[in-house]
């Protein structure tokens, strides 16, 4: 079992090119399954059955593992069995039909509008790194891109004159998104320093060496901007969440937000309606004369 796990991890790293962070999580989850199998005398993946996997999930849940973590474990198991089936090493998948226990859906963290503007309106030095980072921040917030969508952008995916960007989302689905004026200005300023004809790579965002910027490097640059401008932890997906929340708050058009985010299912987008309600509730509590509570009262 361990040998086949190593082969699967090599497949993920070399052929699927998953990040080391994702690979570490998958390996950790699948090693839990191997430990359970060893404990119960199961020597090969083919011998693991749905009842036993269900028992493992129940045990982990009983010991405090979150529904989110258990869902990730099941995803890792399904991925492994897809690989084993494709390689002719197994003929079934014990995770078929299994789902993790339901948990409360956590609302995504967002910046309010003032904080978003504070982040983006700070002074920008006219140098390579500063202009690139500003363009990255503006494009995340302007168009709601995923991290992978941003780092995979090539120069011909952007039409600044038309204010459009074409991205390739999950499942290889392409979509075209608007790019706002501030983001276009930031990109034009970045292009002047990027040297479009010089670097080897056609990526929109590159390093000083002329190579496509990595997702990890973008995470670190966004984190640094959050600490510098806002004094808080910031990650790329928070800018995507903020984009979605602010567009929905202004437009009330859930379907349009779904299309811009590239969500296959509108139920995924509906999480932002809860954020919008939170905002409306906060406005009500601060503005309505009968909503304000006296200090010390809780009823």
UniProtKB/Swiss-Prot annotation:
Protein location: Cytoplasm
GO cellular component labels: cytoplasm
A Pfam match: Phage_integrase
Keyword annotations: Cell cycle, Cell division, Chromosome partition, Cytoplasm, DNA integration, DNA recombination, DNA-binding
Stored InterPro entries: CB, DNA_brk_join_enz, Integrase-like_cat_sf, Integrase_catalytic, Integrase_recombinase_N, Integrase_SAM-like_N, Recomb_XerC, Tyrosine_recombinase_XerC/XerD
Signal sequence range: none
Domain Tyr recombinase stretches: 106-285
One biological process term in Gene Ontology: cell division
Residue ranges of domain Core-binding (CB) in the record: 1-85
Sections of the chain in a coiled coil: none
Gene3D superfamilies: 1.10.150.130, Intergrase catalytic core (1.10.443.10)
SUPFAM superfamilies given in the database record: DNA breaking-rejoining enzymes, lambda integrase-like, N-terminal domain
Catalytic residues (UniProt): 146, 170, 237, 240, 263, 272 (o-(3'-phospho-dna)-tyrosine intermediate)
Cited function: Site-specific tyrosine recombinase, which acts by catalyzing the cutting and rejoining of the recombining DNA molecules. The XerC-XerD complex is essential to convert dimers of the bacterial chromosome into monomers to permit their segregation at cell division. It also contributes to the segregational stability of plasmids.
Family stated for the protein in its record: Belongs to the 'phage' integrase family. XerC subfamily.
Subunit-level organization: Forms a cyclic heterotetrameric complex composed of two molecules of XerC and two molecules of XerD.
Protein's name according to its UniProt entry: Tyrosine recombinase XerC
Natural source organism: Pseudomonas putida (strain ATCC 700007 / DSM 6899 / JCM 31910 / BCRC 17059 / LMG 24140 / F1)
Gene name of this polypeptide: xerC
